[in-house]
Amino acid sequence: MKYQQLENLESGWKWKYLVKKHREGELITRYVEASAAQEAVNLLLALENEPVRVNVWIDRHMNPALLNRMKQTIRARRKRHFNAEHQHTRKKSIDLEFMVWQRLAGLAQRRGKTLSETIVQLIEDAEHKEKYATQMTTLKQDLQALLGKK
């Protein structure tokens, strides 16, 4: 395992995940009967500040169909949490209009690169073009100065 598991922190994430799914209308308990399901949900809501007991609740009451999705969500959250500690692994987001994103994605696909690699390549291309334009302007000025002096 690449990232260390932090039980208290992850239990809080699990609690938030389950409460969010419940509020979205998903069945988070294994119970078919509405009263038993509501009782289990009320018990979960009472566990907000008791992260260790959230895992016990999950073992006893959670809908087994939700287990895999929750594990994937927690694994992704753990990765983002640890990557955020270091500047070079921290992810940034930028707002792009859909058409811009679509063109960038198409270019990345044609070049066989990721979006980030494509953006870096575009920046480097622009920098080279700028440098070339500056060199050409300087060369032109030098040439005019040489021809003008004679």
From Swiss-Prot:
Cystine residue pairs: none
User: Keywords, A to Z?
Assistant: Cell cycle, Cell division, Cytoplasm, DNA-binding
Principal subcellular localization: cytoplasm
Is DNA-binding a UniProt keyword of this protein?
yes
In its UniProt record, a GO molecular function of this protein is: sequence-specific DNA binding
Quote any Pfam family the record assigns. MatP
Set out the biological process GO terms recorded for this chain's protein: cell division; regulation of DNA-templated transcription
Q: Name one GO cellular component term.
A: cytoplasm
Record flagged with keyword Cell cycle: yes
InterPro entries noted in UniProt:
Arc_rbn_hlx_hlx, MatP, MatP_C, MatP_N, MatP_N_sf
Q: Where in the cell is it found?
A: Cytoplasm
Q: Which domain of life is it from?
A: Bacteria
Which HAMAP family does the entry mention?
MatP
NCBIfam families referenced in this protein's UniProt entry, alphabetically = PRK05097.1 (NF003471)
> What exactly does this protein do?
Required for spatial organization of the terminus region of the chromosome (Ter macrodomain) during the cell cycle. Prevents early segregation of duplicated Ter macrodomains during cell division. Binds specifically to matS, which is a 13 bp signature motif repeated within the Ter macrodomain.
Stated family: Belongs to the MatP family.
Please give the subunit comment from the record: Homodimer.
* Annotated protein name in UniProt: Macrodomain Ter protein
- Gene symbol here is matP
